[in-house]
């Protein structure tokens, strides 16, 4: 795993992926990702209907995390082609004590191990570079794929929680 701490937006590189800080040019990609049925079902409907909505979401929700905490969601792209396939990163939620690893991969790229590869790299980066002692994961109770992924990452079910904006109940893994 290569870590780049310069102004270059590339943060992590794995065998098959590059994770970088998103830019405003990623608005179209974010619009596509956040309107997939799986994202809406298991994460939330963020109400993004236009590229302008997605650009606003980047400015108001994604970019401020970098300014406040030094980390956030990264654009996940295929190393060979630069094709964006998802997002993965670290989130500090007001309602959780620990930092949360989050991930979402476009449906057409699911089942290839990309989410695990990205999330494992992000968690390693969080622990070794950012000095985070605890990283947790949160998912919907019926999201079996994410539950298996969190378990594969070494996290275990801790308890049920309520996260505002994420449905009535979520599962916390730690």
Identify the role of each PLM range.
Residues 38-60:
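Conserved GNAT-fold acetyl-CoA-binding loop/helix
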Residues 52, 64-67, 156:
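PAS/LOV-family and closely related PAS-like sensory domains
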Residues 62-75:
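A short helix-loop-beta-strand connector motif used in the catalytic cores of GNAT acetyltransferases and
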Residues 1-42, 75-174:
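Acyl-donor (CoA/ACP) binding surface of acyl/acetyltransferases
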């Amino acid at each position: 795993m290569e870590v780049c701490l310069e102004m270059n937006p590339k943060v992590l590189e794995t065998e098959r992926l590059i994770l970088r800080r998103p830019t405003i040019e990623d608005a179209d990609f974010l619009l596509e990702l956040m309107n997939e049925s799986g994202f809406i079902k298991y994460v939330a409907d963020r109400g993004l209907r236009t590229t302008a909505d997605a650009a606003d979401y980047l400015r108001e929700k994604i970019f401020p995390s970098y300014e406040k905490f030094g980390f956030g969601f990264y654009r996940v792209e295929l190393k060979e082609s630069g094709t964006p396939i998802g997002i993965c990163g670290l989130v500090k939620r007001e309602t959780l004590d620990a930092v949360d690893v989050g991930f979402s991969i476009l449906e057409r790229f699911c089942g290839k191990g990309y989410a695990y590869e990205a999330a494992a790299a992000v968690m390693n980066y969080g622990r070794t570079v950012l000095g985070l002692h605890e990283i947790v994961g949160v998912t919907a109770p019926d999201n079996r794929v994410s539950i298996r992924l969190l378990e594969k990452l070494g996290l275990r079910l801790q308890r049920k929680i309520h996260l505002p904006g994420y449905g009535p109940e979520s599962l916390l893994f730690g």
